[in-house]
Amino acid sequence: MRKYIIVPVLLAVVLVMMCHCTSDRKATVPANEYLIQGELANLSDSIVIGLYVDEGNIFNLVARDTLLNGKFSFRDTVSVTKKMLIMSDNKGFPGTWLEVWIAPGEYIEIKGEDKLLKTWEVVSDIPEQAEENRFTACAMAQQKELMQHLAAEYDWQRMMFIDHAGDQEFEKKGWAKIDSIRKLTTPLRQEIWKKELEYMKEAPISKVWIDKLLLYASMMKYETVMPYKEEVKSLYARMPETEKQTDAGQEITAYIYPPSVAGIGDMMVDGELYDVNDSLRHISEFAGRFILLDFWSSGCGPVSRENPLAKPLRTDNPKEIG
């Protein structure tokens, strides 16, 4: 009889100690800061882990840390809940990222046993992280297999463009390998999308849910890759009108129901634009003439090299330029 009493008591003590340790760690985080602590088994101490922030069409590096005794950490001030991305350029890592949410005063713990980022466990008291984890869990088996293939592809790209840069024969061999890998990754991605879209039918409409719908809506133009257009439209119908009026909601609407393409003789869309001399111009000034509108992306390396104005424009106007 005593055996059956002692075991529950021991379990209760262990749980209390675990909760106490977590509370102690959180208590050490000031109200205006966040703390990420990671512990990775089976990885060498030379590996560099990067923390990035998604700023529209570019990932900006926030901090780096080198693995020491299997551990890494990031700490900084933060005023609002936001999503960060963890990546590594080291060999064997997939060319993708792990979504990690941070918030004021929050402690975030990451644990992993390999280089396959999406398989790492992220634990915190942040609601958005809990929802992010539920999305990942939808198709964990497929995620793990996909990470393995992406790691192989990323290693081939590194060999092609760094280790064997300029070697056309090796590049030809590399692209053949990558093409064969992508034949495996495309159906895996589609399986993951299908499972996540299925989950979204019943999931709460959260910030994570909106981010996912925006991602899938943006992919609808690639019909051969993204075969779930009707599912995306159905999920859009779930969105409250208040969400549809937000910036993200309007962007989703434009992807799902794109504006009509202008034809010859149609009225031009006009607006205030500035030329290289910082003079105010209007497209209507060129009525009756052919106009070439060249759209540049500040997040593209070749664009930044070709157009040096792109970088200061983005730096000086971070909110206006995505």
Predicted features and spans:
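Conserved helix-turn-beta segment immediately C-terminal to the redox Cys motif
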Residues: 305-322
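Short coil/turn connectors between adjacent alpha-helices in alpha-solenoid helical repeat scaffolds
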Residues: 180-184, 220-229
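Amphipathic alpha-helical repeat scaffolds of TPR domains
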Residues: 204-220, 250
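N-proximal helix/coil linker or "cap" segments that precede and/or mark the start of modular domains
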Residues: 227-274, 284-286, 315
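A non-transmembrane, solvent-exposed segment enriched in polar/low-complexity residues
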Residues: 22-187, 191-194
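Bacterial N-terminal signal peptides that target proteins for export
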Residues: 1-8
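C-terminal motif of bacterial Sec signal peptides marking the signal peptidase cleavage site
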Residues: 17-20
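Short active-site neighborhood of thiol/selenol oxidoreductases, capturing the structured segment around
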Residues: 279-304, 310
